[in-house]
Design a protein with these regions (language model features):
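Fold-independent oxyanion-binding glycine-rich loops
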Residues: 13-14, 35-37, 48-49, 56-57, ...
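Predominantly flavin-linked oxidoreductase catalytic cores and closely associated redox partners
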Residues: 46, 113-114, 118-172
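Small-residue (primarily alanine) positions within well-ordered alpha-helices
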Residues: 13-16, 20-25
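Glycine-rich active-site loop/strand segments that organize a redox cofactor
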Residues: 51-99
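Glycine-rich FAD pyrophosphate-binding loop
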Residues: 9, 25-49
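Beta1/beta-strand and adjacent pyrophosphate-binding region of the FAD-binding site
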Residues: 2-16
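Helix-loop-beta segment of a Rossmann-like dinucleotide-binding subdomain
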Residues: 69-77, 91-117, 145-147, 157-159, ...
């Protein structure tokens, strides 16, 4: 597909980027997911001590409250995808979950790789395209659209979703 054909470009193939690309593609958008690393979901594999705590078993108010006043920004995201919907998403893709005493939700297998594999399988089925080893070096907005600049190409698109995360481990 040529760069001009993308309706949505998602930057960053961690948990948020994979979910965003899946949902955009499943809603009929021609979606490109760009990841600077050669492998997607690296932090997923490390989360929860390599078990991947998927979410926390409480209502949205509990999650927002855990972040204090700054947590108010979470309301809209949590309204779009509840804890129950998150659990259902993974269980529908063959990742049964369990709730531990702490309220953390983990895959029954205790393997973060199962979570990543489910996301990558769903991404492939969604029709989204994953481009690995292609960092976005600039995002421009000339007029009503965007241009994503990578070392390999210039990608015009009307919508960009930034899910680049943060540096939670050395070399991120």
């Amino acid at each position: 597909m040529t760069g001009a054909g993308w309706e949505v470009v998602v930057l960053g193939a961690g948990a948020a980027g994979l979910m965003a690309a899946i949902h955009a593609a499943e809603r009929g958008r021609r979606t490109l997911l760009l990841e600077k690393n050669r492998k997607p979901g690296v932090k997923i594999l490390m989360s929860g001590g390599t078990r991947c705590n998927i979410t926390h078993a409480c209502d949205n108010r509990g999650i927002v409250a855990a972040y204090g006043a700054p947590g108010k920004f979470l309301h809209s995201a949590l309204a779009a995808l509840s804890v129950q919907q998150t659990v259902a998403f993974f269980e529908a893709d063959g990742v049964p979950t369990k709730v531990e005493e702490t309220g953390k939700v983990f895959p029954v297998s205790n393997k973060a790789l199962d979570v990543l594999d489910a996301l990558l399988s769903r991404l492939q089925r969604s029709g989204a395209t994953l481009a690995l080893g292609e960092p976005a070096t600039d995002v421009r907005k000339p007029g009503d659209s965007f241009e994503i600049v990578t070392p390999q190409r210039l990608i015009p698109c009307p919508r960009v979703i930034l899910t680049t995360g943060g540096q939670s481990y050395p070399g991120a």
